[in-house]
């Protein structure tokens, strides 16, 4: 016979094979209460849940268009036990009312992997247009503008300026990009001047980091000019 163990169907930290799984999308006008009423819960049970978790999750934060999952008992009673809300691809909130004596809500991230990428380009028009042409995400453009906010006036960028960025992307399920984690290093050639930026962790406990140039000077502290955002490029 076939002895290979069946791969467990794990998502949100649960083995989904142990539950009845209902997936849906929050509709305009939906509330947590209405959704749970449709799923066989009473007003008093819903009130109890909402009051128990209000310090950790406000059910009014549920947004139309976002997916949710209800895990219920697998037997014929199909009693809901968990409500899982996904505000974005990476994060999810679990509301646990499997035991009415200890109702809780907690935030989690899906398992993700970090992929290191390198990109470079030569400015043809504006920085944002050039990065766009190179298929680079807006998030990276904004992070780059933050790195050099103190040293480059982005309104003065000109044709022929060039850049190189080493950065980290977050992926879930191996192929789905869920955003830029951070920039490790960047290089900008502007007006013939070479500007380097290296990301150093300044406090590993607080997880704070700062960018320094090739001489070890903090970019932020050296040039306390007004930061330039992308709105005016």
Residue ranges and their predicted role:
Residues 1-217, 221, 225:
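Intrinsically disordered, low-complexity regulatory tails and linkers that flank structured modules
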Residues 229-232:
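Beta-strand/loop subdomains of soluble extracytoplasmic proteins
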């Amino acid at each position: 016979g076939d002895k290979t163990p069946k791969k467990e169907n794990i998502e949100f930290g649960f083995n989904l094979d142990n539950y009845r799984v209902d997936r849906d999308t929050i509709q305009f006008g939906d509330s947590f209460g209405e959704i749970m009423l449709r799923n066989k819960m009473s007003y008093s049970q819903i009130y109890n849940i909402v009051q128990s978790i209000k310090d950790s999750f406000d059910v009014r934060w549920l947004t139309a268009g976002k997916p949710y999952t209800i895990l219920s008992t697998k037997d014929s009673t199909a009693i809901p036990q968990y409500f899982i809300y996904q505000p974005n691809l990476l994060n999810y909130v679990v509301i646990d009312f499997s035991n009415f004596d200890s109702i809780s809500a907690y935030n989690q991230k899906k398992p993700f992997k970090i992929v290191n990428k390198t990109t470079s380009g030569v400015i043809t028009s504006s920085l944002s247009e050039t990065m766009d042409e190179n298929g680079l995400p807006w998030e990276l453009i904004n992070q780059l503008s933050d790195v050099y906010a103190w040293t480059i006036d982005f309104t003065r960028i000109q044709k022929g300026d060039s850049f190189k960025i080493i950065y980290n992307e977050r992926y879930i399920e191996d192929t789905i990009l869920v955003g830029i984690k951070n920039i490790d290093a960047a290089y900008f050639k502007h007006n013939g001047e070479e500007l380097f930026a290296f990301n150093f962790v300044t406090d590993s406990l607080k997880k704070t980091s700062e960018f320094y140039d090739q001489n070890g000077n903090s970019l932020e502290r050296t040039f306390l000019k007004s930061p330039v955002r992308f709105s005016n490029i």
